[in-house]
């Protein structure tokens, strides 16, 4: 199964966590597309002369990988979900690609203690709270 791992990737902690999740998923036999590894990090590649070109290349590469995935996992950790991840999970939903969430962070977005219902809907309201739940959800797909 090919998995697209959508997650924030803007600081050392996030990059490390994403890499750890990729290794964990690969140890379970999944093929994982992790944007920070495959497309690169835009802030490391661009300068004033190539910003638009680099952004377009990364966007188009990530979109193509979402389309070719069997499943998208959206890492919802953080005070609010990553904006890029929100777009990615919306694309997956629109294209009929299954998606599940992963969130160990107890902070939530709205007054009910839940994340935004539009994000939840794209995930079929399947959000794993730990690795054991995530593994169980993966086996059910």
Language model: regions and residue ranges:
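Conserved catalytic or regulatory cores that recognize and/or transform ribose-phosphate-containing ligands
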Residues: 1-141
């Amino acid at each position: 199964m090919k998995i697209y791992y959508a997650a924030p990737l803007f600081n050392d902690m996030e990059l490390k966590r994403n890499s750890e999740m990729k290794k964990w998923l690969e140890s379970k036999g999944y093929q994982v597309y992790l944007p920070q590894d495959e497309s690169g990090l835009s802030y490391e590649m661009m300068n004033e002369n190539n910003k638009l070109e680099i952004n377009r290349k990364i966007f188009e590469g990530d979109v193509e990988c979402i389309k070719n995935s069997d499943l998208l996992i959206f890492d919802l950790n953080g005070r609010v979900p990553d904006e890029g991840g929100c777009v990615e999970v919306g694309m997956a939903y629109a294209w009929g690609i299954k998606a599940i969430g992963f969130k160990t962070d107890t902070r939530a977005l709205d007054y009910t203690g839940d994340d935004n219902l539009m994000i939840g809907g794209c995930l079929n309201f399947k959000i794993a709270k730990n690795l054991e739940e995530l593994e169980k959800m993966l086996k059910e797909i």
